[in-house]
Amino acid sequence: MYVAVKGGERAIGNAHRLLAHERRGDRDVAEISLPQISEQLSLGVDRVMTEGSLYDRELAALAIKQARGDLIEAIFLVRAFRATLPRLGATEPVDTGTMQVRRRISSTFKDIPGGQVLGPTFDYTHRLLDPQLAEGGAPEAPATAEPLAGMPRVTDILGRDGLIEPSPLADADAPVGDLTREPLSFPADRDLRLQNLARADEGFLLALGYSTQRGYGRSHPFAGEIRFGEVEVEFLAEDAGFAVPLGAIELTECQMVNQFKGSATEAPCFTRGYGLAFGQSERKTMSMALVDRSLRARELAEEIKAPAQDEEFVMSHSDNVQATGFVEHLKLPHYVDFQSELGLLRKLRAEFFAAAGAEPLKEAAE
């Protein structure tokens, strides 16, 4: 017969100690520090901050260390910590047009005001393992350059000529939704959709964005502009009556320029898709911009026929913490449910063999 296995508090405590032992690894190898994770695994830190909805490099590095490099577990840890923090208010919207740019490219124009700035990128590497990294040592110092001049957004250039739709503006008096405080409901406004996409699993968004390029809700995208750098964050101090700078954060912004749109009353123009994420997160912001544009199908009176255009499908399945919890709950005891299924199956098999006039096979579990 089936016997339920009971772990108990002692077994769980032993499992936690074993986890700590495995996390530390070989004691003869130096323990990795939080600054090492933050500085040398910076893209992983950026993803944890973005999908954890908390800009704190040290905390993200700690979460990665505690999670043994499992980024989804690290995101879960960061979100759990975030839930304990007090809310002092909302900052002013950041102005990415004033960004101190470290990287900025456009696939729509070769020559743009401010120029193309490659910055730190894997794009032109050969994707070959570098054995010199295993030996350690300092890399060659990067070339120095003059401070970058002003860089207007490519979409602003198109907008001056009326070639792209105006950036959709929210009602200034309307409250901004908050997915972390209120349950998701449909249909969702764009502010909630963008919040959801910013917190969404990068792999999920990448797959959906890829699906749009393969014809499932195709919107014929161009990477109008991708920029990465520092922007200043300001908080409106009501007592002082003006915005107070809090510091600077690193952001990646992607503006997708998409297929023409027009009607009997409106001239054809390009449409937009938007992505924004903490740190250097180009793959995430590009995928986000592709999916954002697809989710605007209802707004733009387009036929909804692809998964990436279905906001309920996308937004209900994009959260990796929620998805992990639902999938991994299958590891928890389901003894009663299984016994019920097992009893029903045995009854059905007995009826089947009785009707067939055959002897049932002896149950191996007995």
Language model: regions and residue ranges:
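Short, amphipathic alpha-helical interaction segments embedded in low-complexity terminal/linker regions
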Residues: 1-224, 242, 358-366
